[in-house]
């Protein structure tokens, strides 16, 4: 999992990326290509 300041650019890398908020943290998840997983930090 990548940790990035800005998730907007990471979200645009694949069309199946989803922006999810869990426990006060923002994540990018992708059910199809799981290597696009990222967390904001």
UniProtKB/Swiss-Prot annotation:
InterPro entries per the UniProt record, alphabetical: Ribosomal_bL36, Ribosomal_bL36_sp, Ribosomal_L36_bact
GO terms classed as biological process: translation
Annotated signal sequence range: none
Domain of life according to the entry: Bacteria
Pfam families recorded: Ribosomal_L36
Keywords of the record: Ribonucleoprotein, Ribosomal protein
GO molecular function: structural constituent of ribosome
Residue ranges the record marks as coiled coil: none
GO cellular component, one term: ribosome
HAMAP family: Ribosomal_bL36
NCBIfam families: PRK00831.1, rpmJ_bact
Family of this protein: Belongs to the bacterial ribosomal protein bL36 family.
UniProt name for this protein: Large ribosomal subunit protein bL36
Organism: Rhodopseudomonas palustris (strain BisB18)
């Amino acid at each position: 999992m990548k940790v990035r300041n800005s998730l907007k650019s990471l979200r645009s890398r694949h069309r199946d990326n989803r922006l999810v908020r869990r426990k006060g943290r923002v994540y990018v998840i992708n059910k199809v290509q799981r290597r696009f997983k990222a967390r904001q930090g």
